[in-house]
Amino acid sequence: MMRLISIAFVVVLASCGRSGSAISKQLAGSDSLVINFNTPQTNTIDKIVTTTDDKAIKKLRNYVDGKTTEAYKCGYDGNLLFYKNGTLTGDVSFNCSGDGCLHFIMTVDGKLTPTSMSNEAADFLKSLAEGKGWY
């Protein structure tokens, strides 16, 4: 009996290591990214940043894959468009400027999923909007 319990425990632990969040699964393998920055208080695109840099894509994917939060109604500063082999895999809207409104939101498995944005992520996006290209 003890052996059966031990085997079951090992199987559960092994399966936990292979599973990722629904967001990470949806954005996995993204090979290019387009970031649209809006003119403040509008939905008009003011600046576009594109990259195929794996380090930058991974960094932004990890930022988006944060803790689920409430859906704020603060407007959006832009969106991240993740692509894999030319196919859109994720359209993520973000707010990186509003006090108390820092967040990402995207559709995952047919439902809107808001996630929290760290100050580091907000600073990173703001620096890209200002034309700085560090990753």
PLM regions: where:
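Sec-dependent signal peptide recognition
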Residues: 2-7
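Residue-level signal for mature regions of secreted extracellular proteins and peptides
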Residues: 9-10, 67
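C-terminal motif of bacterial Sec signal peptides marking the signal peptidase cleavage site
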Residues: 13-15
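Function-determining sites in protein domains
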Residues: 17-135
